[in-house]
A protein has these predicted regions:
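Short, glycine-/small-residue-rich phosphate/pyrophosphate-handling segment
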Residues: 110-147
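Conserved strand-to-loop "acid loop" that flanks and positions the catalytic carboxylate
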Residues: 84-85, 113
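Structured beta->alpha junctions
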Residues: 11-12, 87, 116, 143
């Protein structure tokens, strides 16, 4: 697990954050929460309402929700583990905003997701479009309520 690692996660409900914090603890990595400038309310997250904020964002490929803070020294990280819930079969638009905000050249990006119903789906490949430069991508994993053994096994594969 050589090189400095960052675990960056977006979590609307707290599930992905808990998994990300556990990954960071086990990997000895730094943790960064991707927090939207405007926090999502329960109404915003109502996927059954086509007019909810999350529905509108996910139906607009150009939507990029603002992020409230930045990673202070992204250049110091060699590996970035990015966690997110699956929305509409892919990563939420805020993950695209995060990936477009930094130069990941020469870094390894390792995505993971949480999902109540669907798996990684096409989210893994879709993220590649948002990153410029020479980046090594590791295959994404779905980690729903993993125990320490599962996380360690996954980290051994990707770090």
């Amino acid at each position: 697990m050589a090189g400095k690692t960052l675990v960056a996660v977006f979590s609307a409900s707290g599930v992905t954050k808990r998994v990300g914090e556990e990954i960071a603890r086990i990997a000895g990595a730094d943790f960064f929460e991707i927090v939207p400038k405007e926090i999502y309310t329960d109404d915003d997250l109502n996927w059954m309402n086509k007019q909810s904020r999350s529905s509108v964002e996910m139906n607009d490929p150009s939507a990029r929700p603002e992020i409230s803070s930045t990673v202070s020294d992204m250049a110091s990280y060699h590996k970035v583990i990015i966690g997110f819930p699956i929305w509409w079969g892919v990563a939420p638009r805020i993950i695209e905003a995060f990936l477009e905000s930094y130069d990941f050249s020469g870094k390894t990006i390792i995505p993971f997701c949480t999902s109540g119903g669907s798996g990684v789906g096409r989210s893994d490949e879709e993220l590649h479009k948002n990153v410029k430069g020479n980046v090594e991508w590791k295959k994404g994993a779905q980690l729903n309520r993993p125990d320490e053994t599962v996380i360690r096994g996954w980290l051994d594969e990707v770090l």
